[in-house]
Amino acid sequence: MFGPAARFPYDPKAAYIPADAPFEVLQKLHGRLGIERAVIVHASCHGADMRVTLDAIARSGGRYRGTAIIDESYGDLEFKKMHDGGIRGVRFNFVRHLGGPPEMGFFNRTVERVQAMGWHLILHLDAADLVEFDALFRKIRVPMVIDHMGRVKAADGLQQKPFQVLLEWMKQDNFWVKICGAERVSSKGPPFTDAVPFGRALVEAAPERVLWGTDWPHPNVKWMPDDGALVDLFPLMVPEPALQQRILVENPESLYGFQGR
């Protein structure tokens, strides 16, 4: 979600300032798509000001959880407030267009904090980062969710080094992946079906640690997707009804603490 800026101002240091895409619009989208529960990924354009995400979770009547972006000012009180407000993870943007990798001392301290909270990390990476930070991430034992299928490029094929690294990560029981962002993985554009084999391969690797999401409202994309069309890609990646139930319902219940956890 973005804004509205009049109530939830954007970070003046943000890499991008989007048009408002507030809670009310998200509600309409979820109603149209038939989505009952969701995880709000706090947007980098709001910086470490978590008010917009905490407000949405509070207004959701228990249907939403969220992930955070933090800075060095966050201590015990802030983490307790976020946990009580439905936050269950901290996201780091390694991608260069959003500022690049974090300061490693801060990153390592946050890993320790996340472990103590029983949360997880969300890693937003470019394909090259999967190779560059391979050794670092393999040493971390807290749960880690890799966003957007690692932002690999479909044109480079399933055998490309970054995707093979991602598949190796999925052999460790603390790595998770989101099979979202087909519009970012695709090299051909709509309907983004060239991203489907990547999602399918990840599901085959570890269906018990795969998540799905819309990635709405799709900032910084070359092709603005239709959200209904993105939903239609899901059964192409996951044709089995039992695995659909697992990925859409059971996996997020486990990781994000729905139903009171």
Give the location of each predicted region.
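Conserved, mostly hydrophobic/aromatic
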Residues: H30, T53, M82, V90, ...
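Catalytic pocket-lining loop regions of alpha/beta-barrel enzymes
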Residues: E103-W212, G260
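Active-site metal-binding loops of divalent metal-dependent hydrolases
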Residues: M1, A43, M149, T214-W216
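An N-terminally biased module of ancient metal coordination in phosphate/nucleic-acid-related enzymes
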Residues: M1-A48
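Mid-to-C-terminal alpha-helical segments outside catalytic/metal-binding sites
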Residues: I17-R37, A201, P207-R209, K222-R261
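A generic "structured core" feature
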Residues: M1, G31, G105-F106, T110, ...
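Short, electropositive alpha-helical surface patch
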Residues: A48-Y64, V196-A206, D227-L236
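Active-site gating/metal-coordination segments in enzymes
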Residues: C45-A128, A135-R138, W176-A182
